[in-house]
């Protein structure tokens, strides 16, 4: 697995260099000013993107991708997008969104699924986030806001409390793994954990997404099922995993 990961990184670097070189060549055709600045930017960007620490971070993130076996994904649904996903989630349910930001997706959860109770969990690092949530959802019924760390929030609720939750926080392997473990017992048997950014390697600023690794590892270790994935071509995908009916 380590060899395949290293080969993947080598190919990724090669492809990026090829595309960037092509871009540089195209910019010269249009007499773009400060072409030396463009060259400097890409050279510095690639230097930061592919240092040894980034290589290791990406490898650590993808090393668990083969945890799953076929029985974990049998019957998995492909769903067009995450709004269509909401249409298939349980209605009149006890729900949480973990990672609310300004509340736009929470508003869609509320409108589409008509929850019995909707818990909105976020540290709300900036005032504008909480102000936006209050503006959009503050007058809605059956909504409770929790300004708390996503992992620690699991301690707030009783076991088997939620029908389903949706996670959209910092997308790292470590945080996602901790969130899944924190909320696993809080989900009713047969209930769901869903979340955003279900892919693996993001190259923005050398940042490695680890949601897929964390989800696959959790499913395999706890014998859950990968219930559904979304297929957005221009937006990050979502996942749904299901807790076994006989698991407390």
For the regions a protein language model found, what residue spans apply to each?
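S-adenosylmethionine/decaboxylated-SAM
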Residues: 67-77, 82-248
């Amino acid at each position: 697995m380590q060899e395949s990961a290293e080969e993947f990184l080598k190919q990724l670097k090669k492809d990026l260099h090829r595309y960037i070189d092509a871009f540089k060549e195209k910019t010269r055709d249009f007499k773009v000013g400060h072409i030396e600045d463009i060259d400097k930017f890409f050279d510095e960007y690639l230097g930061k993107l592919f240092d040894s620490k980034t290589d290791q971070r990406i490898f650590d993130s993808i090393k668990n991708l083969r945890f799953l076996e076929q029985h974990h994904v049998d019957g998995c649904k492909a769903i067009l997008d995450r709004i269509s996903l909401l249409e298939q989630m349980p209605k009149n349910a006890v729900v949480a969104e973990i990672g609310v930001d300004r509340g736009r997706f929470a508003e869609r959860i509320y409108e589409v699924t008509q929850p019995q109770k909707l818990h909105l969990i976020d540290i709300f690092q900036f005032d504008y986030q909480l102000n936006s949530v209050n503006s959009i959802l503050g007058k809605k019924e059956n909504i409770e806001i929790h300004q708390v760390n996503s992992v620690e929030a699991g301690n707030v609720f009783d076991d088997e409390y939620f029908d389903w939750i949706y996670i959209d926080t910092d997308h790292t392997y470590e945080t996602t793994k901790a969130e899944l473990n924190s909320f696993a017992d809080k989900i009713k048997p047969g209930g769901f954990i869903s979340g955003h950014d279900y892919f693996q390697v993001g190259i923005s600023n050398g940042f490695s997404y680890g949601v897929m690794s964390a989800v696959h590892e959790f499913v395999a270790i706890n014998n859950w099922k990968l219930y559904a994935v979304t297929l957005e071509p221009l937006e990050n995908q979502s996942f749904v995993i299901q807790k076994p009916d006989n698991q407390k």
